[in-house]
Amino acid sequence: MIDTVYGFGQGLMGGIWPATVWPVLWALIKIVCVLLPLMGCVAYLTLWERKAIGFTQIRFGPNRVGPFGLLQPIADALKLLTKEIIMPTAASKGLFVLGPIMTIMPALAAWAVIPFGPDIALSNINAGLLFLMAITSMEVYGVIIAGWASNSKYAFLGAMRASAQMVSYEIAMGFCLVVVLMVSASLNMTDIVMSQAKGIAVGYGLNFLSWNWLPLLPIFVVYFISGLAETNRHPFDVVEGESEIVAGHMVEYSGMAFAMFFLAEYANMWLVAILAVILFLGGWLSPVDWWLFNLIPGWIWLGAKTFVVVTMFLWVRATFPRFRYDQIMRLGWKIFIPVTLVWLVVVGAWMQTPYNIWK
C-alpha cells in the first residue's frame, strides 16, 4: 500500500516538479506521519499516567477539563506555551538553549528506524539496532550541558546524578541488545521481529512462546528495569526527587524549554516500550495463531503490546518507593552488568549446542 501511494505521488508530481523533489517531499510526509501521532501519544500518556496513579490511590485523577478530563493535555500544552522562558543572568546563553534541543532530538531521531509493520518504517536500514544504540547515547550530552549552562549548583548536581545514572544503565541495556543481536543474527529491526516467528511453539499455534522474552527472560527483566533507570522514571527518579533537588538539571528552565525535557522523557518511555515489544515480545506478530487474531492488523498488535509495557512503567511508579542513589548505582554496576555478561556467555554457549532453539 505504501509503495502504491509513493508510486502515485511520483507519477502525479513527476510532470510538475524535478525528479528529486518528490523523494524529499515523501520523506517529509513520512516524518510528519510518525512525529504527529508520537506527540499525541506523549501528551495523552501524561493523562493516562495521572488517571492510572489516581486509580491506585482510589481517586479520580484529572476530570475537570473536557469530558472525563480528556482535554487536560491540551490545557497543559497551552499553559506551557504561554509561560515566559526565564534565563538566569549568569547562565551560558548559547548552551542554555542547546541543552533542551540536544535532549529531545535523539528521542525523536531514534524513531526513524522503528518498524510499525513488515514494510512500515521511516528507514528500514540493516544497522537499525546499532543506530538506536548510538543515537540514544547522545541524550546524556544534553543533560550535562543543561546542568552546566544553568550556572546553578542544584542544576549541576542534578546533571551529574542524571548523567552517571544514564551511563551506568546504558551499559546493561547495551549488553541486553547484544544478546538479542546474537540470537537474531541481524541488526535489522524487521529481521529481529521475523526471527521470533519461528520455533517449536509456532507449530502448535502458540506464537508467544517462541518470542525472545521466554528464553531470554533474565535479559528481558534487566532491559525493563534498566529502561526505567535510563529514562529517570520512578523508582529511579532521584534526579528530580521532590524532597531533595526538585527538578534536577531542569530546575532553571521554564515554559517550552522545560516542556522539551518533559517531552523527551515521555518520548523515551514510548521508545523503550516499543523496543521491548520489538526485541522480546514479537513486535507486530499475533500471540496466537487463531483466525480471529490473524484478522487484526499487525500495527494494532504492536500498539497494544506497547501500551501494556508503558502501563507497567506507570504501575511501577504507583507502587514502589524511590531508591537511594547508592542503591541505584550498586544495582547497575554490581548486579545488572554481571548478570548480562554471564547471560551473554550462556546464550553464546547455548547456540553452539545441539539444543540451539534459534536455528
Curated annotation (Swiss-Prot):
* Cystine pairs: none
Q: Which BP terms in the Gene Ontology apply to this protein?
A: aerobic respiration
Could you give one GO CC term from the UniProt record?
plasma membrane
Q: Which reaction does it catalyse?
A: a quinone + NADH + 5 H(+)(in) = a quinol + NAD(+) + 4 H(+)(out)
For this protein, the parts annotated as crossing the membrane are 16-36, 94-114, 129-149, 167-187, 208-228, 261-281, 296-316, 331-351
Give the membrane topology, semicolon-separated if more than one: Multi-pass membrane protein
The EC designation for this entry is 7.1.1.-
One Pfam match, by short name? NADHdh
Cross-referenced InterPro entries:
NADH_UbQ_OxRdtase_su1/FPO, NADH_UbQ_OxRdtase_su1_CS
Q: Where in the cell is it found?
A: Cell inner membrane
A GO molecular function for this record? NADH dehydrogenase activity
Top-level taxon of the source organism: Bacteria
UniProt entry keywords in alphabetical sequence: Cell inner membrane, Cell membrane, Membrane, NAD, Quinone, Translocase, Transmembrane, Transmembrane helix, Ubiquinone
The family annotation for this protein states: Belongs to the complex I subunit 1 family.
Please explain the role this protein plays, according to its UniProt record: NDH-1 shuttles electrons from NADH, via FMN and iron-sulfur (Fe-S) centers, to quinones in the respiratory chain. The immediate electron acceptor for the enzyme in this species is believed to be ubiquinone. Couples the redox reaction to proton translocation (for every two electrons transferred, four hydrogen ions are translocated across the cytoplasmic membrane), and thus conserves the redox energy in a proton gradient. This subunit may bind ubiquinone.
Subunit structure, as described in the record: NDH-1 is composed of 14 different subunits. Subunits NuoA, H, J, K, L, M, N constitute the membrane sector of the complex.
Q: Which HAMAP family match?
A: NDH1_NuoH
Q: What is this protein called?
A: NADH-quinone oxidoreductase subunit H
Which species?
A: Polaromonas sp. (strain JS666 / ATCC BAA-500)
Q: Which gene encodes it?
A: nuoH
